[in-house]
Amino acid sequence: MLKMRTALIIVLILTAALARAQSSDWQSHLREELPLLGHRNWIAIVDSAYPLQTSTGIETIETNSNHLDVIKEVFDQLSKVKHVRPVIFTDTELKAVPETDAAGITAYREALAKLLATSEPQSLPHEQIIAKLDEAGKTFHILVLKTNLTIPYTSVFIRLDCGYWTADQEKRLREKMRKP
């Protein structure tokens, strides 16, 4: 019994140390992984209550960092690469959460709007986005960066698309291929 308890304590200590190492090094991990990510991969910046998903392709990292800072860093890193471009999704619920139920939500919405001012984020119900990640995670890699934010429906989901080939170019190609 004592040996089992000691072993359990050691496992818990090692797990905590690993989590601490992961949270302090999420930026390096993002920089290393970004060149490997491509079209159909996702990056999600999520609040602290976001669930740990179990699809094999989903990797979750606890950043222990400010939510808006993580969003800024991800967009900064994405701006430095040419091979992918972000398609941004936010929770539909974000627009409806009242300040009286979630203190700080108004300031968050305003700050997020400034960060996303040059983009066109799409809005979908939270459960639909989780389902999209779950499905994509069966085949493609999903990087989930969990932050210390405790305001609901504040996650930002980024589906990566090809940075050097547009949807219009793909459509023209498919049309040309259909013609004899």
Regions found by a protein language model. Give the residues of each.
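Feature captures the catalytic cores and cofactor-binding loops of soluble hydro-lyases/lyases
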Residues: 51-52, 60-82, 86, 106-126
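Ordered, amphipathic secondary-structure segments that act as subunit-interaction surfaces
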Residues: 83-106
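Structural motif
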Residues: 41-44, 59, 85-89, 121, ...
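Hydrophobic h-region of N-terminal signal peptides that target proteins for export
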Residues: 12-20
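Bacterial N-terminal signal peptides that target proteins for export
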Residues: 1-8
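Glycine-rich, aromatic-bearing surface loops/beta-hairpins
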Residues: 101-180
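Long, hydrophobic N-terminal alpha-helical segment
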Residues: 20-68
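Flexible, charged surface loops at secondary-structure boundaries
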Residues: 36-38, 80-83, 136-139
